[in-house]
Amino acid sequence: MSQAEQNFMITYARRKSARASCYIKPGNGKVFVNDIPIEIIPIEVVRYKIMEPLVLAGDKITSSIEARIYTQGGGIMGQADAARMALARALVKFTNSKELVEIYKSYDRTMLAGDPRQTESEKWMRYSARRWRQKAYR
């Protein structure tokens, strides 16, 4: 394996029905989400959610990497959560730092471990997963 292949990390993450993959390598601090620079993502909540692992990691680590995140499926926030998880896992794997793992776990455990909750499916003869027809006694 060459030196360039050793410094290249790929991680995956899922949240609900959204999937994300993160490709990380040494670089100059640029992060792209679906080939769009993270700075120009129009929805601020999504942008800040994806940037959380970078902010927690610090400027020293952030300025020395280049990350490309590709998301598909699900909704906007599901994709943002999956991208955040994939980026956090990639940074931990790339830096091989126990301190970074502890920082992420103390801030939000789902950055590394994930969130297994799924939408409950709709049942037959019901309007939704739990809603039933109102019962009339008179």
Curated annotation (Swiss-Prot):
GO MF entries: RNA binding; structural constituent of ribosome
Pfam family, one: Ribosomal_S9
GO cellular component terms listed in the entry, alphabetical order: cytosolic small ribosomal subunit
Protein name: Small ribosomal subunit protein uS9
Biological process per Gene Ontology, one example term: maturation of SSU-rRNA from tricistronic rRNA transcript (SSU-rRNA, 5.8S rRNA, LSU-rRNA)
InterPro entries registered for this protein in UniProt: Ribosomal_Su5_D2-typ_SF, Ribosomal_uS9, Ribosomal_uS9_archaeal, Ribosomal_uS9_CS, Ribsml_uS5_D2-typ_fold_subgr
Family classification: Belongs to the universal ribosomal protein uS9 family.
UniProt keyword terms in alphabetical order: Ribonucleoprotein, Ribosomal protein
